[in-house]
A protein has these predicted regions:
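Intrinsically disordered, low-complexity terminal tails/loops enriched in metal-binding residues
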Residues: 2-7, 14-124
Length: 124
């Protein structure tokens, strides 16, 4: 009887964790980049010919970027570089960076409400 009770508890807990994972939706890239989630938002980092673009959405809807500030820190082996993120339409852009496979990127953002958000990526 005890084993049956423990099995029921384990099954219930696994079902709860599955629903929590589904609540945030899928992390599929919309712009061909690498996706990460933080602060209930989805972030997509995309390598561009001039640097990088960062798209932000909230459950599939683009986030208003007016007043958002931040920077990208790029770690490629022993090399470290940084660039300021600026609003460019529906995305934030950082120029002068080179993103290659295996590069680690940290986005440090500040929202208009002065909330700090840190997002980490590994370029694939």
């Amino acid at each position: 009887m005890k084993n049956l009770l423990w099995a029921a508890v384990a099954l219930s807990l696994s079902a709860l964790s599955f629903n929590v994972a589904l609540a945030h939706g899928e992390n599929k890239p919309k712009h061909g980049g690498v996706v990460s989630a933080a602060s209930d938002l989805h972030f997509e980092l995309v390598a561009t010919s001039t640097g990088a673009a960062l798209y932000i959405d909230d459950h599939g809807k683009p986030v208003a970027l007016t007043g958002m500030t931040g920077k990208l820190t790029v770690l490629n082996g022993t090399e470290k570089s940084e660039a300021v993120l600026t609003v460019a339409g529906d995305k934030l852009e950082a120029k002068g960076l080179k993103l290659v496979k295996g590069t680690k990127v940290v986005a440090a953002l500040t929202t208009p409400a002065k909330k700090a958000i840190t997002v980490r990526f590994t370029v694939k």
